[in-house]
Amino acid sequence: MKARSKAKTKAKTKAKPAETRPLYTIGYQLAKPAAVLDELKRAKIEILVDTRAVAASRRPGFSKRQLAASLDDAGIGYIHLQKLGTPAEGRTAARSGDIDALWRIYDKHIKTPEARAELDGLVDLIKTGKRLALLCYCRDPKTCHRSRIVANVKRRTSVKVEDLIPSLF
């Protein structure tokens, strides 16, 4: 009886300060919507932050409305920070494999007042302590603009970053 009551008693722990919680990133390239959702649930994500300039996809389940609906069904919030997305000329450079041009274009874009305002909003959201994941198409975070967003966030916070990689099966 004594052991049972001890098992029911939960130890009180202090909540982690907001900036010590990881900021997650995830790309959906090659993955099915269910695999992305499973990975978000596994990481206990509370809000998915869509960082695509255009929240549309030829891949079923990844356009804004479909994605937001499936996230809502799973109890995960959705926010679209469009101005943190890669501008059209950057997406063209990425498709052609010119990563240096992509970075030049994106680094210039992230300095615009509109992008800075959304970056400020993202930093404020991080400071709430919610478990967030940044979403874009690219599977590899090193070749995605998410890495540039993260670099900007890390200059302003002490947040750690973890990249989620959804299963391909």
Which residues does each PLM region occupy?
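Residues lining hydrophobic/aromatic ligand-binding pockets adjacent to catalytic sites
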Residues: 1-169
